[in-house]
Amino acid sequence: MQQRIDLVGKIGSMALIRPEDHDIDYNIFSRLGHALRPGMIWVSSGATEIGRLDYLRRHGHELDNGIDEMKTDYAAQGQAILMENYRRFIDPKYSVRQVLVEHQHFNDPEKRAHLQGLFFRAAEQDAIPIVNYNDPVSFTENRKMELIALKKQHEDVVECIDNDETAAVIAEAVHARTLLLMTGVDGIYADPQDPSTLIREISAKTPEALEKKVRELQKSCVGASRPGANGAKAKLEYALRSALSGTHVIIGHAKHHLNDLLAESVPCTVIGLD
């Protein structure tokens, strides 16, 4: 029987902080921590922003070196704090395992298989993997050159800079039953300017029909929640990839409890094949 992981979930940076207070939102960490259990893989952004806030609080000013250097330095500082808070709130009877990934861990078959083994063993060993992109050691120009070289060899190359993509790629690798993308809105809207147009379900009987529906919705997707984010259009692209591989996809607001989103008892968008 094929091994499967129950859930791959992802939460974005801005959902983990209180911008008005320049601080971490500990309530979010608490809610998530109490809901996470073995059989789940949690992809968490937040290291860079949390590192920035921590540096600002300790020194009274932000770093003023180059963009790549700032991202590297903030991410290195924030990752430790990110993991500290997950460990603080996850049930102490469960192990917590940090997994930092880059694109080559999914584009190289041997490295991909190595990660698959790590994730499946975690479920068996009562451990919860917390995954993030390894920003402190990822240099933009080198990464671009590596990706260009890979794309010359084959078409199906993943970048995984966006943790929505990272979550979708992991969901495919571990044959996840559900992919949950937590974001700053309730889901996908027919009209992004009108909250009443939330689309509760995007489904079809065939892969071709589902892809057609998603492509139509992508035409109305504009903007993103913050600079550097890829927005709803990219989120739909990654969700489609998972749905076509047989994973049930849920996109919903991070303010809701994880279990309520999984039960679809709160506003959200569900994507999948009938």
Language-model segments: which ranges?
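C-terminal catalytic "cap/lid" subdomain
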Residues: 1-274
